Amino acid sequence: MKELMVRENYNLDETIAKDLFEGVTYPWEVLPKIGTFIKELGAELDPEEYEKRGEDVWVAKSAKVFESAYIHGPAIIGKNAEVRHCAFIRGNAIVGEGAVVGNSTELKNVVLFNKVQVPHYNYVGDSVLGYKAHMGAGSITSNVKSDKTLVKVHAPKGDIETGLKKFGAMLGDEV
């Protein structure tokens, strides 16, 4: 299942969350760990570069967050990122450097690597989006199966049990 592994699909130098991926094989393995990781990393961020805006919310001073955007922690908004009009960040969200979270886009339990774009009316939940990944307008990473059972990844050499009830999308770099 090499084609699904973190090291095959993601440049970990393109995320502030590099340490989150230590010791994992598949990208979905980080999903249950995002919130705790943000709280630990946020406490260590340089106050010259990041400001704390509420409970467990850190925003780079160079980031642009529109007044109508809502950010619920834990969350880290990276340098030069944009969180645009009416964006809704529900928590457990890492928004990478230079990333764009657009108009009416909703994020929950995600890692967006640097320069990711989710610019228009997107829902991204329980997902990892690699460096320069882009989701078109209205894209949704529906994250719960209709029968509410645990998600399996169907791979060429057989199914992989994720142990997760919620699972959105794993987009590699430049997808």
Identify what each model region corresponds to.
Residues 62, 66-68:
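WD40 beta-propeller repeat fold
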Residues 42, 69-77, 82-172:
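Flexible, glycine/small-residue-enriched loop-and-beta-strand segment within the central core
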Residues 1-56, 61:
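Terminal amphipathic alpha-helical/low-complexity segments used for targeting or macromolecular assembly
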